[in-house]
């Protein structure tokens, strides 16, 4: 989308975490409202507290206190698929807040070969077991093991096969080929220690046309991110 269109806009970042995306957008809009259910909101406030146009709320996306039309633009990137409610229903429920919405939801690997989905099925079984681990030191030890034993080898294989144009056939490679090791490690932690993970197909997202005037699904990574217009 055209970020220049946010000049003069009031923006909401739902599930802001530590404020990574808000840091990028704060200087591009009139006001940005950051919302998160966890104590990450305090980290976001520490990072962005010097921005006079930033407001911080600790709250539940499923029970927001904002009136219809409170914002010009709402976005939630990589959050709604971790909520205990169907993520597309949550998207529909947020429609009154703004005229334009941007979301990123985990994809169901519907545009990938079948073996991607087989690997995902195995990883999902592993995640459901690992998410019960509570000790932080144990979690980070497991994260390191998965980083070096699964993620980096696959990314390395993808990089090698990319020399002959076959890199995209390797799981994880396309998304992580330009990412730093620290970013990949954080993603491994987030991926395996969450209890709830929903995934959607492109066809699932298309059903949002029953609620929004227009739904534009990006053909580019990460899958799927899409813009909804009221």
Regions found by a protein language model. Give the residues of each.
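A short glycine-rich, Lys/Arg-flanked "PGG" loop and its adjoining helix->strand segment in the class I
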Residues: 88-100
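Substrate-binding/catalytic lobe of Class I Rossmann-like enzymes that use SAM or dcSAM, i.e.
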Residues: 131-202
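Conserved alpha-helix/loop element of class I SAM-dependent methyltransferases that forms part
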Residues: 1-10, 24
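Conserved beta-strand/loop positions that form the S-adenosyl-L-methionine
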Residues: 14
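Core SAM-dependent methyltransferase catalytic element
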Residues: 218-230
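A conserved beta-strand element that flanks and buttresses the S-adenosyl-L-methionine
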Residues: 75
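Class I SAM-dependent methyltransferase SAM/SAH-binding core
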Residues: 18-63
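Conserved class I S-adenosyl-L-methionine
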Residues: 100-142
């Amino acid at each position: 989308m055209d970020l220049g269109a946010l000049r003069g806009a009031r923006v909401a970042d739902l599930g802001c975490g530590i404020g990574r995306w808000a840091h990028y957008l704060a200087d591009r809009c009139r006001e940005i409202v950051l919302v998160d259910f966890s104590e990450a909101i305090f980290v976001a406030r520490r990072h962005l507290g010097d921005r006079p146009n930033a407001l911080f709320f600790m709250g539940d996306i499923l029970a927001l206190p904002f009136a219809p039309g409170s914002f010009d633009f709402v976005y939630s990137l990589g959050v709604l698929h971790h909520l205990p409610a169907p993520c597309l229903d949550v998207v529909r429920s947020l429609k009154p807040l703004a005229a334009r919405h941007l979301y990123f939801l985990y994809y169901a690997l519907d545009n990938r070969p079948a073996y991607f989905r087989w690997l995902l099925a195995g990883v999902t079984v592993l995640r459901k077991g690992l998410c019960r681990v509570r000790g932080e030191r144990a979690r980070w030890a497991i994260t390191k093991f998965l980083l070096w034993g699964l993620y980096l080898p696959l990314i390395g294989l993808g990089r090698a096969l990319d020399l002959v144009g076959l890199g995209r056939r390797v799981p994880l490679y396309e998304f992580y080929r330009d990412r730093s090791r620290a970013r990949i490690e954080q993603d491994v932690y987030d991926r395996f220690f969450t209890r709830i993970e929903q995934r959607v197909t492109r066809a699932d997202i298309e059903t949002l046309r029953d609620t929004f005037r227009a739904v534009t699904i990006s053909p580019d990574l990460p899958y799927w991110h899409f813009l909804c217009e009221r």
